[in-house]
Amino acid sequence: MSKDIHDSRILILDFGSQYTQLIARRVREIGVYCELWAWDVTEEQIREFNPQGIILSGGPESTTLENSPRAPEYVFNAGVPVLGICYGMQTMAAQLGGSVHSSDKKEFGYAQVEKVGNCALFDAIEDHITDGGNGVLDVWMSHGDKVMDIPQSFKTTAKTSTCPHAAMSNEEKRFYGVQFHPEVTHTHQGQRLLERFAIDICGCEKLWTAAKIIDNAIERIKETVGDDEVILGLSGGVDSSVVAMLIHRAIGEKLTCVFVDNGLLRLNEGQQVMDMFGNKFGLNIVKVEAEEQFLNDLAGKSDPEDKRKAIGHTFINVFDEQAKKLKNAKWLAQGTIYPDVIESAASATGKAHVIKSHHNVGGLPADMKMGLVEPLRELFKDEVRKIGLELGLPYDMLYRHPFPGPGLGVRVLGEIKKEYCDLLRRADAIFIEELHKAELYHKVSQAFTVFLPVKSVGVMGDARKYDWVVSLRCVETIDFMTARWSHLPYEFLGVVSNRIINEIDGISRVVYDISGKPPATIEWE
């Protein structure tokens, strides 16, 4: 009998670092399943999860403060290897009898750590060798506190000029602490260190692969729904597209996809979705023309949150109407992914602050008596894309820039009108087309056009024109938490601007948004 892909597993306890999800993604890239839980997990929950190793993440708190987060005592009594990263190392040291002090010299950014003695975690892993023969690692630091005294039975395994205990270990208990962040790419050997911990020290097997994830998902879908029919709201985005392919592979024609054309999509997007999933892949797909209904429900609304809620409410009503026509559908499929699950858990505990309401429609109508199928709820976005490729979806679709759930509803500023959407669709298509032509599209993280509800004077030939303004927006980011505006070539911007103004009657001016995040958000609304 083949092994379950979840049999080898690592537990990551989150102490609030901005890099914690990155740790989980790196561990999974190695081929090992892991889950991310809040630091205040109970002993019973850890026992039930039964991990082969535990990682303690970094965090913004200070272990020198009385009420700062601590790892559950059971973590150090569970008999499995433990890796503490940054704050995780500090709380390990403090809880096991060492001491942590605030440092006069804080370390943020690139640093070199020199290996000291022998350590299973670092063995034969280094970037440089000192004249004295010691290995050196290029790493990324981000800490204000430091371990002053390591616990008894621990030894120092790395140091810097300002941090005498940059890493420590208890080889007998297989406890390891590193003051730097192996999960970020700036730590050049970081992935090797995480692999050393997960595979060699914890004894995990590489069971978490795209092909095995697909097989497991299909098996679970079949077990869950049996011979029942399933309905899916297909948007053409990455998540719902991969869900559609997975469920179709599992149950074939018993899946009905509902594609709602709300009039807020990109140019020709509705036809592209129908061609790909209906004609090419042979899915059972129902297209609902709902532009008029959405625009009517949005009339008079200019506040972004009001627009979002109206779009979400109308979608639920339209979708519910279709679902009632499919009397045999007993299951609703959704494209929930792992970060959504983490975000929901954080919100439930009051640890998250809502900046914008979530784009995805949350919850079902009270009278929709259906079970829920969420085949992607264990997966990060990069994993969803990888299995999408394995399922045969085209690269350009899977790696297309993010498009918000409300679509052009949050890219037309103020009140939504069909005229504005039509102008914006064409302007945005020109911008994206030129990015592809210049081979810039996949070098930036997100690019789009925004319709501004203001008019500007222009001149065409000898005639004066007084028409609308659009703004181009293009950013580069790793995690979308922060972003810098893309420094696109002036010549390129000139080509885009000229094409938009010359080819689209109704637009007289094009501007370029040079706001970073923070202080601005990536989307305007």
Curated annotation (Swiss-Prot):
Q: What is its EC number?
A: 6.3.5.2
Quaternary structure annotation from Swiss-Prot or TrEMBL: Homodimer.
Using the record's annotation, list all stretches that form the GMPS ATP-PPase domain: 208-400
Q: Which domain of life is it from?
A: Bacteria
Question: Could you tell me what reaction this enzyme catalyses?
Answer: XMP + L-glutamine + ATP + H2O = GMP + L-glutamate + AMP + diphosphate + 2 H(+)
Enumerate the residues binding ATP. Answer: S235, G236, G237, V238, D239, S240, S241
- What cellular component terms from Gene Ontology apply here? cytosol
Q: Name one GO molecular function term.
A: ATP binding
Kindly state which keywords UniProt assigns to this record, in alphabetical order. Answer: ATP-binding, Glutamine amidotransferase, GMP biosynthesis, Ligase, Nucleotide-binding, Purine biosynthesis
Q: What does this protein do?
A: Catalyzes the synthesis of GMP from XMP.
Matches recorded under PROSITE patterns: GATASE_TYPE_1, GMPS_ATP_PPASE
Annotated organism of origin: Pseudoalteromonas translucida (strain TAC 125)
| Record's protein name | GMP synthase [glutamine-hydrolyzing]
Q: In which pathway does it act?
A: Purine metabolism; GMP biosynthesis; GMP from XMP (L-Gln route): step 1/1
Q: Which cysteines are joined by disulfide bonds?
A: none
Q: Which Pfam families match?
A: GATase (PF00117), GMP_synt_C (PF00958), NAD_synthase (PF02540)
Q: Which residues form the active site?
A: C86 (nucleophile), H181, E183
Boundaries of each Glutamine amidotransferase type-1 domain copy?
9-207
